[in-house]
From Swiss-Prot:
Catalyzes the formation of N(4)-acetylcytidine (ac(4)C) at the wobble position of tRNA(Met), by using acetyl-CoA as an acetyl donor and ATP (or GTP). The keyword ATP-binding applies. Acetyl-CoA binds at residues 461-463, 468-474, 506. It is found in: Cytoplasm. Its main location: cytoplasm. PANTHER family: N-ACETYLTRANSFERASE 10 (PTHR10925), RNA CYTIDINE ACETYLTRANSFERASE (PTHR10925:SF5). Belongs to the RNA cytidine acetyltransferase family. TmcA subfamily. It comes from Salmonella typhimurium (strain LT2 / SGSC1412 / ATCC 700720). This is tRNA(Met) cytidine acetyltransferase TmcA. It catalyses: cytidine(34) in elongator tRNA(Met) + acetyl-CoA + ATP + H2O = N(4)-acetylcytidine(34) in elongator tRNA(Met) + ADP + phosphate + CoA + H(+).
Length: 672
C-alpha cells in the first residue's frame, strides 16, 4: 500500500470512528511545509492553515483564531516552527470535525529545548525570544507517551500506522442528544431568571442553544462577541435566528422573551450585566476550558452574582467520539484536567519552595500546583503554563499535606529599574516590558523613583477548597516575606471585591491604588496593594496610601464605587501635587492618573480652563468637549487640557513651575 493509500485508509477509519488525530511534523521549515502540502493535497477538506505567514488559503494568524471559535473545519495545519502559541493551538483543535487531522509543524526535534521561541515575547517579559526548555521537554515527554499521536521527523523513517478498530461512531442527527434533551426540558419550564450551559468544546452548547430557539414558544434574540462565531447556533435555530451585536442591542431597546448569549465569557462583564438586566429570561453559554481563561472567571465571578442561577453542564462530546485522541493529547499537553481537586489533601501543612526544573525532575508536583491555580483563577490559560515553565524571575511556594498540594503561591520579580528609566515611566515616555505593579507605581503614582525599588508581585495564590479558612494563604504570604527579605515589598494586583480585600489586609498589605476601569474578565476595578519589607518599601507604601486617601472622594465620584479607606479631605496643593501636575502639563502623564491633583488645581485656579473643567467637573465626554470647543479628536483635546493645566500652574507660581520642569527627564524641552 502506498503512503497516500495508507493515509487515506487511516483517515477513513478515523471518520467512521468519529475521532481526530495529531500529526507532529518536525524538521527544517521548508521540509515541514512540503510534507504538510503533500498531505493537504491527498485529503479533501477545509485545511485551515494557522501561521504568521501561511502559504495557502484559508488561513489566519494564531492571534486571529479567536474570531473563528464557534465554527467547524475539516483538517487544519498549525505552524509553530517559529513560536508555539499554545492557546491558539488548543482553540484550533476544538474547531475540528470528526475524522480530521491536525498537523503541527515544529522545528527539528533535537533543537526544541535550545531554540528561541518567538511566542515567549508575549509572556516572558524579555526583549528577545528565549529558549523554552521546560515546555519543550514536557511536550516531548507527553508526545512520546501517547501511541495515538504521530511524530514524523526529518531524516527519520516514518510510516502510517494501523490501529485496532474502535466502535463505529454515530454522528449527531440534529435531534437533541440525551444530555441536551434533559436541559431543553428544564429550560422550557424555567421561571424568569438566568441559566448557564457550560462545557468544554465539542459538547454541543451552540447546537443546544439553537435547538432551544427553534422549539421555544416565545421570542429570542441572540448576541455573541462576533456573529461569525454563531454559525452552528444559527444553523440549528433556522429561520428563528435573530442576531444583534451586544453594543447594538443595548442601544436599540429591543425586547424578547429570551436573550441567548453565546460564548458569554468573552463579553466584558459590565456589558453583560447590562444585557442581563434587560430581559426576563437569559441563557448564557460558555466554554470552560483552559485555553479560554476568562471562561473560568465566568464561573468564579459572574455566575456568583445570581443566587438562583440555573446551571447546566454538558459532558458527552457531540461533535466527535469519546476518548478522541486529539482532545486527549491537547488536554494532557496543556494540563486541562483538574485532578488536583479530585481528592482532598488531609493532614498537617508543610510549606516549601520549588523551582522550574521540577517540571523535568518531578513533574507531578508543578502539574498539581498548576491544576490548583487553574481551578481557582479565572484568568489562567496556556500562556500562564508557558510562563510558569520557562519565564525568568518566577518564584513558587507550595503548601502540602501528606504529599498532596493544598495551596500554592506564585510570585514574579519586579522593579529594580534604573533611576532614569523609572523617571521616564513616571513621565509617560517609556513603558518597558513586564513589571506590572512596579511600573504602575511609577506611571500612576507620585514618586518618579518608585520603579527603582525591588519587589515580588503575587501572580497567583490558591488554596484547595477543602482546606480553605485555615489560614494557609496567610502562611504562604508569610513564608514569601521571609524568602524575599532582600526585597523592598511584596505587591498584588487584583479585581477588587470587599471579600478579597479583607484577605489581603489580613496578610498585611496596604492599599495604594484603585484603577479607573473595570476589568473585562471580572467586572471589578483593579486594586493594587503593597506589603512593605524594607524602610524604602514602607516609605513608598505610606506615601501612596496617603495619596489614595487624599484622592478617595474624587475617585469614588468618578468610578461610582466607594474606596475602602478613610478619605483625607485636604484640598491644599502639596509638593507631590505640584510635581504630578507638572508631569501632566509638560510630559505625558495620563489625565485619569492625575484626577486628584487636577481637581485640587481647579479649586485653586480662577481661570476658566474649559477643557479641564468640562471633563472633570461637568464629566462631559471627549466627543461633547471636542464639539463644544471646536477641536478635532482626542489627541487635540488632551493637548489642550495639558496646555490649560500649564496655564493654571504658571498663573499660580511661574517660578516653581519652571524649576519642576527643569528636573524632569529632558528638562524644559517638553512643550506644554
Amino acid at each position: 500500500m502506498s503512503d497516500i493509500d495508507a493515509l487515506q485508509a487511516l483517515t477513513s477509519q478515523m471518520t467512521q470512528e468519529g475521532i481526530r488525530r495529531l500529526l507532529v511534523i518536525s524538521g527544517d521549515a521548508a521540509w515541514c511545509r512540503k510534507r504538510a502540502e503533500a498531505i493537504r493535497a491527498a485529503l479533501p477538506g477545509d485545511w485551515l492553515w494557522v501561521a504568521p505567514d501561511a502559504p495557502a488559503q484559508p488561513c489566519c494568524t494564531p492571534q486571529a483564531l479567536q474570531t473563528l471559535l464557534g465554527r467547524e473545519f475539516r483538517h487544519a495545519i498549525f505552524d509553530a516552527w517559529q513560536g508555539f502559541d499554545a492557546a491558539a493551538f488548543a482553540a484550533l483543535s476544538g474547531t475540528l470535525q470528526a475524522g480530521s487531522w491536525l498537523l503541527l509543524l515544529m522545528p527539528p526535534y533535537e533543537t526544541w529545548e535550545s531554540r528561541p521561541d518567538t511566542d515567549s515575547l508575549r509572556w516572558s517579559d524579555c526583549a528577545q525570544p528565549i529558549p523554552t526548555p521546560q515546555f519543550a521537554q514536557h511536550l516531548k515527554r507527553t508526545l512520546s507517551r501517547d501511541p495515538q499521536t504521530l511524530l514524523w521527523r526529518q531524516r527519520q523513517p516514518f510510516c502510517w500506522p494501523s490501529y485496532p478498530s474502535r466502535e463505529c461512531w454515530r454522528p449527531a442527527t440534529g435531534e437533541p442528544q440525551p444530555e441536551q434533551a434533559a436541559i431543553l426540558s428544564r429550560l422550557r419550564e424555567m421561571p424568569p431568571g438566568v441559566a448557564t450551559v457550560i462545557a468544554p468544546r465539542g459538547r454541543g452548547k451552540s447546537a443546544l442553544a439553537g435547538q432551544f430557539i427553534s422549539r421555544m414558544a416565545g421570542t429570542a434574540i441572540v448576541t455573541a462577541p462576533a456573529k461569525t462565531a454563531t454559525d452552528i447556533l444559527a444553523a440549528f435555530a433556522g429561520e428563528r435566528f435573530c442576531f444583534m451585536a451586544p453594543d447594538a442591542l443595548l442601544a436599540s431597546g429591543a425586547r424578547a422573551d429570551w436573550l441567548v448569549v453565546d460564548e458569554a465569557a468573552a463579553i466584558p462583564t459590565p456589558l453583560l450585566l447590562q444585557l442581563v438586566s434587560r430581559f426576563p429570561r437569559i441563557l448564557l453559554t460558555t466554554t470552560v476550558q483552559g485555553y479560554e481563561g476568562t471562561g473560568r472567571g465566568f464561573l468564579l465571578k459572574f455566575c456568583a452574582r445570581f443566587p438562583q442561577l440555573h446551571r447546566f453542564t454538558l459532558r458527552q462530546p457531540v461533535r466527535w467520539a469519546p476518548e478522541c485522541p486529539l482532545e486527549n493529547i491537547v488536554s494532557e499537553a496543556l494540563i486541562f484536567d483538574d485532578e488536583a481537586f479530585a481528592q482532598a489533601p488531609h493532614g498537617a501543612i508543610e510549606i516549601s519552595a520549588f523551582y522550574q526544573q521540577a517540571w523535568v525532575n518531578t513533574p507531578a508536583l508543578p502539574r498539581a500546583v498548576y491544576q490548583l491555580l487553574s481551578g481557582a483563577h479565572y484568568r489562567t490559560s496556556p500562556l500562564d503554563l508557558r510562563r510558569m515553565m520557562d519565564a525568568p524571575g518566577q518564584h513558587f511556594l507550595q503548601a502540602t499535606a501528606n504529599n498532596r498540594v493544598a495551596g500554592a503561591l506564585w510570585l514574579v520579580e519586579e522593579g529594580g529599574l534604573s533611576a532614569e528609566l523609572s523617571q521616564a515611566v513616571w513621565c509617560g515616555f517609556r513603558r518597558p516590558r513586564g513589571n506590572l505593579v512596579a511600573q504602575s507605581l511609577a506611571a500612576h503614582g507620585s514618586d518618579p523613583l518608585a520603579a527603582t525599588l525591588v519587589g515580588r508581585r503575587v501572580s497567583r495564590i490558591a488554596v484547595h477548597p477543602a482546606r480553605q479558612r485555615e489560614g494557609i494563604g496567610q502562611q504562604l504570604i508569610a513564608c514569601a516575606c521571609m524568602q524575599a527579605a532582600q526585597c523592598d515589598y511584596l505587591s498584588v494586583s487584583f479585581g477588587y471585591t470587599p471579600k478579597l480585600w479583607r484577605f489581603w489586609q489580613r496578610c498585611g498589605f496596604v492599599l495604594v491604588r484603585m484603577g479607573n476601569h473595570r476589568e473585562a474578565s471580572s467586572g471589578c476595578y483593579t486594586a493594587m496593594a503593597l506589603l512593605p519589607l524594607s524602610d524604602a518599601g514602607k516609605r513608598l507604601a505610606q506615601q501612596e496610601h496617603r495619596r489614595l486617601r487624599r484622592d478617595a472622594d474624587i475617585l469614588t465620584q468618578w468610578n461610582g464605587e466607594a474606596i475602602p479607606l478613610a478619605a483625607l479631605r485636604e484640598q491644599a496643593l502639596n509638593d507631590e501635587d505640584w510635581r504630578e501636575l507638572v508631569g501632566f502639563a509638560f510630559a505625558h502623564r495620563p489625565l485619569l492618573t492625575s484626577l486628584g491633583c487636577l481637581h485640587r488645581l481647579l479649586q485653586y485656579s480662577a481661570l476658566p480652563l474649559p477643557a479641564l473643567r468640562g471633563r472633570l467637573e461637568e464629566k462631559a465626554s471627549d466627543a461633547e468637549l471636542c464639539a463644544r470647543l471646536r477641536i478635532s479628536g482626542r489627541k487635540a483635546l488632551l493637548a489642550l487640557q495639558r496646555a490649560q493645566a500649564a496655564q493654571a500652574l504658571i498663573a499660580l507660581d511661574a517660578g516653581r513651575t519652571q524649576s519642576l520642569r527643569d528636573v524632569m527627564p529632558g528638562g524644559g524641552d517638553h512643550a506644554g
